Amino acid sequence: MTTPSLADLPPQSRSLLQTQTIELPSWAFGNSGTRFRVFTTAGAPRDPFEKIDDVAQVNAFTGITPRVSLHIPWDKVDDYDRLRRHAEERGIGIGTVNSNVFQDEDYKLGSLCNPDEKIRAKAIAHHLECIDIMRAVGAPALKIWLADGTNYPGQDSIRERQDRLADSLAQIYAALDSDQRLVLEYKFFEPAFYHTDVPDWGTSLVHCLALGERAKVVLDTGHHAPGTNIEFIVAQLLRLGRLGAFDFNSRFYADDDLIVGAADPYQLFRIMNEIVDAGALAPDSGVNFMLDQCHNLEEKIPGEIRSATNVQEATAKALLVDREALSAARAVGDVLAANDVFVDAFNTDVRPLLAELRESQGLDPDPMRAFLASGYLERIRSERVGGDAAGWGA
């Protein structure tokens, strides 16, 4: 395939690319690390306000990251109205509020699934607090990821833990406003090693179906066993109208939270192909595209710029798949021809097309180069001196 230009895209595909947005995680800008060490970065934000300043920088140079996810209590402030105004003044909306029931001593044996009713009540109360914060900042979604599970057979009743989870989720869901939704994330292991209470998309889906139409599944690309066909899961959840959001990242071994597309760009393309094929890239599709990453070694803002442009490149390639040729090859059972159509799109260099798109939007065609030349990193390194840098509370 020759190098395409923006004009080679059909008007609908061009519009989808122009309106694509990706939500950034506030915690990606703070100091983070592995279970062995949290590494520090000069100029790391010290509070949620400075995190939002950094989010705004990514959006200023990519044009596709106008929202931020908050994590409570990492992003607790005294005045949420002030935080919302601070974000709005920088062109940033608050998209998702993430709960945290995995860093309190009381949650040693679980949170929403804990056998102790008092601890379950505490975990539910935290989610109700998150819903209040959603109202204050105008966030439409509550995202729940649970570390709940067991390490040894016999430690607790698997069935009873599911019953407790269903009851806890029902209480949280009932507290949502009519314009708010709940998205439930799954992870196949870690930190629980015998069984995890929400280990897979089927478990998340079962609970969401029981809750109601405003409960949907979050798919974190790093939360699967090696070799899992993630695009198959994407297709199934889209068929059912229950794919609520992505947490994009990359992994080599487990939940590595590396830059999306770094380990397997072909997988990212295959995922975005299912999104495009199902019409789920449209802004009103109900699918929220988010990043969930920790930049342990690299600079935070450049890492998020690279991540956003990686998703954008995979999307552009998916939009270039020749659907007519693909359908024709499938209709006659021409396996290699169908695969060729697919691979041709993946192997296309879409960087010139995206540079053209950015120029048409008044942006620099090379967002990474432009950001590094802006002097912002040097400025925050000199200005953000004193105080405690934001982190993940580990």
Regions found by a protein language model. Give the residues of each.
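Glycine-rich, aromatic-flanked loop segments that form ligand/cofactor-binding clefts
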Residues: 19-29, 72-102, 133
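Active-site-proximal loop/turn and secondary-structure-junction residues that shape catalytic pockets
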Residues: 28-30, 72-76, 98-103, 146-150, ...
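Histidine-acidic metal/acid-base catalytic patches
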Residues: 1-29, 37-40, 56, 154, ...
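N-terminal small/glycine-rich loop or linker at the start of catalytic domains
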Residues: 20-39, 100-114, 146-152
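Short, acidic/polar
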Residues: 41-58, 124-132, 227-236
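Active-site acidic/histidine proton-transfer and metal-coordination neighborhood
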Residues: 6-16, 94, 106-212, 216, ...
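Catalytic domains of carbohydrate-active enzymes, especially glycoside hydrolases
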Residues: 15-24, 28, 41-74
